[in-house]
Amino acid sequence: MKKRIVSLLLALVMVLSLVPATVWAAENHDGQVRVVVENTTYAKANGAAWDGTLVDKWVDLAPGSSMMDCIVSALGTYSQTGAESGYISEINGLSAGDGGAASGWMGTLNDWFTNVGFKDIKAGDKLFAGDIIRVMYTTNGYGADIGGDWNTQSDTSLAALSFSEGVLTPDFASDKTAYTLTLPQGVTGIRMTATASNKNNQVYLTADGTDYRRVETVPVHNGTVLTIRCGDKAAATEWSPAITPTTYTVTVSQEGDAPQGDLDVSFKGLHSAQLASLKLYDFADGIKGD
C-alpha cells in the first residue's frame, strides 16, 4: 500500500513539473505595475499606423523608477520617441499630429490623468505595485475623447461605481450620493471600481478613516462606511473653472450580522436586591463551561 501511495505521489510531481511556471504565477503581480498602450480613437482604416491594444503587460517596479520607465520597459522592442525628454510623441509609428491638430499621446495612472509628467511620478511616492498605467492616443480636444475634457473639469461626479462583491442599492446614478452595499456573510474585503465623469479629477477612497488606493482590497465589516471623493477643491483661475469635489458614501451591510462596535452593558436602574441576584461571569468561567 505504501509503495502504491509513493508511486502516485511521484506521478503527481511529474505531472506538475510539466505545467509552465507562468500558470501558477499568472495572478501573482507582487512588485509589478500593469501597463496598457492603446489607440481606440484613430482607426487604421483612416490612416493610423495601427489601432487597438499594442501592449497590455505587467512589468517590474524597480526602486526609484518612474511611470515613464515602466512604459518604456513595457514597450520593449516597439519604437517610441521622446521618453527621455519626458513627453512621448510617437509609439510604433503612430505620432502626435497624425490624427489631427489636437492628436497625440496621453496617459492615466489608475484612471486619472496625472497633473505632473510621467517622469515625475516615482515608485514609493505616487507609484506603487498593483497600479495601472494606461497610455492612450487622443484625436479630439486634447483628451476629451478618452475621458479628460478640459471644458468640463468642474464636473466632479462619478460616471460609474461598482464593487467586486455584493449588491449596491439603490442602483447607481451620478446624482445619488448615498448607498448601501449588501455583502454575503464571510466577505472581509472588497475592491472598488469608480469612474470619474471627467478623468482629470482624481478619485479618492476612505474606509473607516483609512485611505486606500483604487487598486487595493479594502477590509470591511458590517457597518463599514466607505467615503468616495471625486476631485480636489480649487478656486477658479484664468484657465480653469472652480472645482468643488463630490462625495459619495457607501455603508456596508453584512447579511446576518449586527454592526460591529463596543458592547455597552448597563445595570443602571436596577435596585440593590436585583443587583445582588445577578451572577456575573468572566472569560475563564465561559471556557470552563460554568
What are these regions (language model features)?
Residues 1-5, 9:
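Positively charged n-region of N-terminal signal peptides that target proteins for export
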Residues 16-31:
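Sec-dependent signal peptide cleavage junction
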Residues 27-58:
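Eukaryote-biased recognition of intrinsically disordered, low-complexity regulatory segments
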Residues 67-125:
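Hydrophobic, secondary-structure "cap" segments at the distal end of domains
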Residues 129-133:
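Loop/turn positions that initiate beta-strands
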Residues 136-146:
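Short, charged beta-turn/beta-strand-edge "cap" motif at the junction between a beta-strand
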Residues 146-278:
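Beta-rich interaction/scaffold domains
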Residues 282-290:
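Short, tryptophan-glycine- and acidic/Ser/Thr-enriched carbohydrate-recognition patches
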